[in-house]
Amino acid sequence: MVTSRTWFTAKQKVELWERWKNGHARGVLKKELTAQLRTRRQMRHAKGVKAKNGQGHILDMVSIRERPAEAEDRAVPGHWEGDLLTGASDTHIVTLVERHSRFTMLVKLPRKDTTTVVAALAKHIRKLPEQLRRSLTWDQGKEMSGHKRFTVTTNVQVYFCDPRSPWQRGSNENTNGLLRQYFPRGTDLSRFSQAYLNVIALRLNQRPRKTLAFETPANRLQLVLH
């Protein structure tokens, strides 16, 4: 039986997600499984392809299936996962997680249109050393319809996840869950400065992670830079 004290491995969480997705978790079981999510939220319905869900056809998308093996197995640093954390009144923060180290960057976002998103992302990515600028994986949100402009500006290729496949950005999804401790649902995210977002990112980057043998993301990233 699943109880409020039950803990799951990352693999088990993926399996639970599959049960939700396939409609196999109902009634009491669904409530119990929901309690296991760090944010205590119901199943996140993956964004569909309809424009009303913030999705639409993106020209010249490159599929995640074409992403290099070095990104898939996390062997080489510089491959990022990205998403938007959503708050009240259609406010957003860009969340970026480096796959090798789980290092997190947060980007203040005044608006969600693709011009604003691409410009904000490019500004932060260009500050990184060249070896940390290899690829970016995103879902099929229309905010990244300007991905070609982003690639030209940063020389970072964007790969798009399959529809309804949040586990293809698993590190980013997990980090967004951690961030809800600081930015609960219903929070107006526009009131936070970039300086404050940097402080929160630093807290996450200095937190030991089991998946890194209890090393911190900050330390892991420093190792690859020296």
Identify what each model region corresponds to:
Residues 77-86:
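Two-metal-ion RNase H-like nuclease active-site motif
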Residues 72, 85-105:
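Short conserved beta-strand segments at catalytic cores or DNA/RNA-binding microdomains
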Residues 8-25:
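Short, amphipathic alpha-helical "recognition" segments used to contact nucleic acids or chromatin
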